[in-house]
Amino acid sequence: MEPTAAPDDSSSDHPERRRGPSRRTVVLGALGAAVVLGAGIPVTLRLLDRPTGKLVTPLLASKPFYAAHRGGSLDWPEMSLYAYQQSVAHGIDALEMSLARTSDGVWFGLHDPTLDRTSGTDAFVASEHTWAEVQQHRILPQNTVDHRQPSRPYLKFESLVEAYGTTHTIFVDPKVVDPQYYPELFALMTKLVEKPKETFIAKGYGFLPAWAEAASAEGLQTWGYYYGAEIEAESDRLVSTQGSWSILGLDYEATAADWTLVRSYGKPVIGHIIPSKAAATTALGHGARGLMVSGVTQVLG
């Protein structure tokens, strides 16, 4: 029997607290800061010796490539504009966003059905509230390595795409949204960028391929993430679902045998969810093409 929801894709590691900026960080006093128009949020300028982002075709031709899980969920309040700005400043190749949809049809970054974990609310179901009501809350830093940093506003999907849709691949996971709204999401993607196939990759839990099948029909690349322990328990479900995904994913803690099995399908494999350089080294050693990274400052430094 298939599960009704994907398991939590949070990192299980807790790396040491973030250290100061590396010697390659741009010195703001010398070079100034970029300011997001209309938001007034200072952004660290891109590190000078890092590449810019990659759209889908060059991303999948790269090895390794790096995607920011929820914008870098160990470092900054997840899926906030600030998190994505900082990941881009660190030279990340791609960005990832889980999506919820408000009662008035606004798509925004949220991993859960409610704001409870991210904002400390009590049974605040996103789909039952308007965007104006969501905006009354902030994303807390309690799930990051620096609990003292400021909380941040929730971010519309279209705002993320407007900022980075022409420079960075965006992994899109409508994790808690009813499939009846998928056509609406595809229409929004098409409206926001000229070439959706070069901006978006549909991301989802490997054992639940409905999103992949809908996205494939739109011509999008798809990434299905799996866990080694689940594959070992139900290997037949990997066999029956992997064909729906053009890219596969496996957790870095999976065994070498699990990695060999997943790689045997001849598709690119993304290691997840990477909190540290040690985890990155492990996944790359198993043959990962790319990494879905929660600890951006840990991995990219």
Where are these regions (language model features)?
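Metal-dependent phosphodiesterase/phospholipase catalytic core, i.e.
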Residues: 111-214
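Structural preference for beta-strand elements that scaffold enzyme active sites
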Residues: 65-67, 94, 169-171, 199-201, ...
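Conserved, mostly hydrophobic/aromatic
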Residues: 69, 87, 98, 134, ...
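Catalytic domains of carbohydrate-active enzymes, especially glycoside hydrolases
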Residues: 86-99, 243-245
